[in-house]
Amino acid sequence: MAIFERRRFLQLTGFAAASAASLLLPRSVWSQTDTSRKFQSNPFALGVASGSPTHESVVLWTRLVESSLDSRAVVVRWEVADDDAFSRIVQSGQHLATADLGHSVHVELQNLQSDRWYFYRFMVGDAVSSIGRTRTFPKAGAVVEKLKISYASCQRWETGYFTAYKHMQAEKPDAVLFLGDYIYEYPGNPVSALRLPSSTSSFGFVLTLDDYRNRYAQYKSDTDLQAMHAACPWLMTWDDHEVQNDYAGLTAGDSGFADVFSKHEDFTLRRAAAYQAYYENMPIRATALTKSLAGLVSGAEMRIYQRVDVGQLASFYMLDPRQYRDRQACSKDGKLGASMVNPAKCTDWLDPKRTMLGAQQESWLSHELASAKQRGSVWNVMAQSTLFGLRDNIAGNGQSFFNDGWDGYAPARKRLTDALQKHAVYNPVMLGGDLHENWVGYLKADYSQNAAAKAAPAIGVEFCGTSITSTAGSSAVEKTPERLAENPHFVFADAKFRGYGVVEFSSKQLTTTLRTVDNVRAKTTTVETLAQFVVTAGRTVIERV
């Protein structure tokens, strides 16, 4: 029997109607709401979240999980208030949670006041969710004195506890930028795992829609992660492990375990299941599903890239470097996925047609950057899933680059830096993840390793963050000093510690603080500052403080 049942996906053609249920359902449906229904366990066990904030709108999220839930739809009530006692309710309503969407709830609030904090909660039967806190951003053109964001990535369940989020919550950020690898699709190793993932798949892999739903439910059971979601809105992008290690567009990657994934007969269906589960479990807008759920089955996009403005202080460009990319160039022995590659031996390395973002997203980003000066944003932050700057992994003679990152898509990287220069974008900042290491450095117009390119002034700064729990490996820790010396456009690197980053913006400067926990394998941790950097607006200089 095939791992994926195509008929199951083709039944999900009514997504558009389901997503707008709160507006279109007849009064007779709302009259069936059973406020006296008793639940044996908490249907809100996965917590609450909010995301995609604008100056007047934000998405509220929850997903019901309870043993008595079946294929029937459930009417969920929601409230938004000015205070956590809900004595001043500003909006309320009902939403239909359908089984076809995993009983997820996405409420897209509108007509909120700008630059305000709100409280929200959900109710079904006798159950009431935990209280979430969210906010809107200032209006376009508004003068904003300060903004604090945290960024994080790469949280593998079995390699540690998500205690970094407990410390992040204490930072009281205005928003969290999550930069990929929210879940991992691998089976757990009972020998080395700290805590094992569950899976309904006979292989122990995440392969089906139910598998993905269960994996998200497991990760979201972490109380520190839940609390951070409830504390402020999140802006999201993904990397590969939300689907499969090293996948590229509609090309399967490398499972690392007997090639179970790469031998699957229809990767498009597997990606569709992963994308649907991502939507079901994240506070993102319904417009991300550009051609409904049915479109995913035939390879349609799930558009998660977007621009979010915070008055005149900052514009955030949330990018998607995974969904539209070409296959990795010159992977060894014809293998799927990533390899370390010597570009001198790879004829495709500098092919100008190769893309990381895809033609449409590249065009969109260029257009957005072209209007950045007119918007007047002091800081222009591109948030994506991996290291942007060139990193040669061999000291001295010879070259070795990772073909799954931007190094493997050098012409696409050059097009982006050309756009930054062409449009004279103010204060470009690149944020990334993926490596499970901290790297801090300069954006270069040209990463060619000749003397002129190396001597040319920088055009922006980059902060690539470490992981929440995922390990970097002992060899990465050992080789970091020589890799840093080999790539002088970077000023700091560390592969030893897990944690997150905090960026504080003002009109005069940004301050980035790298925060690390002492031991992800302990349920109680301490947090320390690994390093702190200041960049003055208008000066592309990174100062360590």
Indicate where each model-derived feature is located:
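Metal-dependent phosphoester/phosphodiester hydrolase catalytic core
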Residues: 2-545
